[in-house]
Amino acid sequence: MRTNQYANFPKDFLWGGAIAASQADGAYTVDGKQPNSSDVQPYLKGLSNEEIQFLEKQGMTVAMVKEGLADTTHFYPKRHGIDFYHTYESDLELLAEMGLKAFRTSIDWSRVFPNGDENTPNEAALAHYEKMIDKIRAVGMEPIITMLHYEMPINLTLTYGGWTNKAVISLFERYGKCLLDRLGHKVKYWIVINQINMIQIEPWLSLGICKDQYENMAQAEYQGVHNQLVAVAKVRAYAKTLDAELQMGTMVADGTVYPYSCRPDDVVLAMQHNRMQYFFTDVQFRGEYPKFAWNYFKENQISLEVTEDELQLLRENTMDYLAISYYFSQMVDATKNTNKADAITPNPYLEANPWGWEIDPQGLYNSLSQYWDRYQKPILIAENGFGMYDKIEAGKIQDDYRTSYLGDHIEQVGRAIYDGAEIIAYCAWGPIDIVSCSSQQMSKRYGFIYVDIDDEGNGTRKRLKKESFNWYKSVIESDGAQL
């Protein structure tokens, strides 16, 4: 290990780990659960990582969703996860050995309201999640709970058209109120919707919309996220009537880009690209739609259905903290790219993992600094991690590539704190191996704990500590002073 030159983390800093129900829980048909948006994504055997990621970005059609529901041939990894639904007690005890001070996970909407539009919740699901949260607290961790992390009930996608339908606002509001009523006295930190800005990268998982249902997909995406923003504001308003001390956060996947060069066209495109990423957080922290967003909508033939009551609700219900995920930085070249979230160019100065995710610790420092300067709101790092193939040799997994990545990024978190940013938590993504969100693979591993399951669901399910397990334990014990 090495000494962190920016070892100035506050004593109440939350060193944690994060997973999602859709990638970990499994128990696909247990306790009344119905399918959700993640359950219809198959593992695409025989394809390269590049091919898998290309197909994932293409989105889903109604036919693909229905085929997924009826399919008995292919393997759907997220239906099985790592069976965390049944193993959470022992898994949390194992994670607690590292000294985690916080644990982030999500509640599956399709368990609590299996079809999304029921009048009453599923008690079996609520009882399960209450017991899980009790266990998180019992082992000494602060629960950080996400209400929606890519677990939209399939019925709401096929019957209602996903988040483009304003009826879904009230359905989600009912769900959110239900969680707060049952669990609000046990959970201080809530993330209402995971990565709310991923509408152009993952429209199916983010919004539950099928690409063949709309001629203008951008129109559907931004109408969908407007409805999400309204729903978040409604849930936040209700939370504050229950307990003013509840911390209601919004979350984005960091999409900050660099210009390819100092050529003015590159610099301006990067600025425009970044502003449309700040759009989501501008609304939720400044309470208003920025003028540049209205200009963008007009230029792209996007006409939103927005009411004055909704705009007033947004003004009155700004969020308490910003949660971000950060894995890599991005770059734009005006000769090749447009002002669209996935229009990016590889950075020749950075190395990447086998999935093309570029490694840029200073990019995290840059993004944290930009967010802090813009909003002056507490920041919670909800996800940061390094997906890689792990190999067992002589009964051990030597994953120094993971500790190197995480150590370099944690140092940059300390650097942002040194500059004055208020950062309250760092949650390593996937502290125990789970199914990859973007590729449906188990072999894309992030954890400090290895789970013996392969990409096709085979394996003993046994847990094995990697070398990084003791490394992260030492990081926490030293409050980030030793990396």
Task: Identify the role of each PLM range.
Residues T87-D108, E316-L322:
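Catalytic domains of carbohydrate-active enzymes, especially glycoside hydrolases
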Residues I107-P121:
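Glycine-rich, proline-tolerant flexible connector loops at the mouths of alpha/beta enzymes
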Residues H80-E93, P114, A125:
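Internal amphipathic alpha-helical repeat/solenoid segments
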Residues R2-T72, N115-D117, L126-L483:
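Active-site region of glycoside hydrolase catalytic domains
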Residues T73-T87, T164-K166:
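Active-site mouth loops of central-metabolism enzymes
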